[in-house]
Amino acid sequence: MHRASHHELRAMFRALLDSSRCYHTASVFDPMSARIAADLGFECGILGGSVASLQVLAAPDFALITLSEFVEQATRIGRVARLPVIADADHGYGNALNVMRTVVELERAGIAALTIEDTLLPAQFGRKSTDLICVEEGVGKIRAALEARVDPALTIIARTNAELIDVDAVIQRTLAYQEAGADGICLVGVRDFAHLEAIAEHLHIPLMLVTYGNPQLRDDARLARLGVRVVVNGHAAYFAAIKATYDCLREERGAVASDLTASELSKKYTFPEEYQAWARDYMEVKE
């Protein structure tokens, strides 16, 4: 069986972006899940930052995973992947220079595309966890990412959160990233089609949409007409794996089946309340 090179996988992803269809990603988190996704016919996969944190650290999504840890997991996937994989590279693990290092390492790992977001990460002392960096810094990160890539087929996608700012600010940011040379725009927090249309009409590069299964956005044909080429519904496969592991081990110990959901199990074993308490204790301004 022919195993596509990393460049060929990147070209395959570019072809998806150049098409007139809308594709749904498979959540891939290790080599086995990547092989399964390809065998089932998924056109592309995504290694989510939150999922990588769970898989590598058993920690909640508090930007705790390091670039090296993330790249190691991406490399394991890249060794076997027969489908293009997008890396959720969070904020690029630092400033624009860190973004350049991130691109170099993920390109070497075999990733087909990566997203760089403009959220202020990791959370800063005395700042809201939902703050965004300024547009100018976001543009600098995208320009740095483009400069750092060696294979021109590697897709650089600028990501922003449409839920945290008004639509005019979203348009301003996405236009700036488009002008900076981003190959695509990733939108999180889009409410419905009216919200999406207000943003999409200003853009001429492909869109990637993180919907988390939002029922207001379940129309692939309409999404495609608006320029959406990639949809991320979430990471249900990973959480199903957690649930299956828990239920299997409980049964081996002779326990009855549990009614805990996958989401509840994730919280049970990643201790988010502890991290939140530490953040309040060490990172908030005391009155």
Curated annotation (Swiss-Prot):
Enzyme class per UniProt: lyase
Any Pfam family: PEP_mutase
Known partners and oligomeric status: Homotetramer; dimer of dimers.
Name of this protein: Oxaloacetate decarboxylase
EC number, UniProt record: 4.1.1.112
Regulation (activators, inhibitors): Not inhibited by 3,3-difluoroxaloacetate.
Keywords: Decarboxylase, Lyase, Magnesium, Metal-binding
Note accompanying the cofactor annotation: Binds 1 Mg(2+) ion per subunit.
Effect on the protein of changing H235Q: No change in substrate affinity and 3-fold decrease in activity
HAMAP family: OadC (MF_01299)
Amino-acid positions noted as binding substrate in the UniProt annotation, renumbered to this chain: S50, R159, H235
Keyword Ubl conjugation: no
MF terms (GO), sorted A to Z: magnesium ion binding; methylisocitrate lyase activity; oxaloacetate decarboxylase activity
Catalysed reaction equations from the record: oxaloacetate + H(+) = pyruvate + CO2
Biological function: Catalyzes the decarboxylation of oxaloacetate into pyruvate with high efficiency. Is also able to decarboxylate 3-methyloxaloacetate. Seems to play a role in maintaining cellular concentrations of bicarbonate and pyruvate.
pH influence on activity: There is nearly no change in activity from pH 5 to 10.
Needed cofactors: Mg(2+)
Provenance organism: Pseudomonas aeruginosa (strain ATCC 15692 / DSM 22644 / CIP 104116 / JCM 14847 / LMG 12228 / 1C / PRS 101 / PAO1)
GO BP term, pick one: oxaloacetate metabolic process
Binding site for Mg(2+): D88
Similarity comment text for this entry: Belongs to the isocitrate lyase/PEP mutase superfamily. Oxaloacetate decarboxylase family.
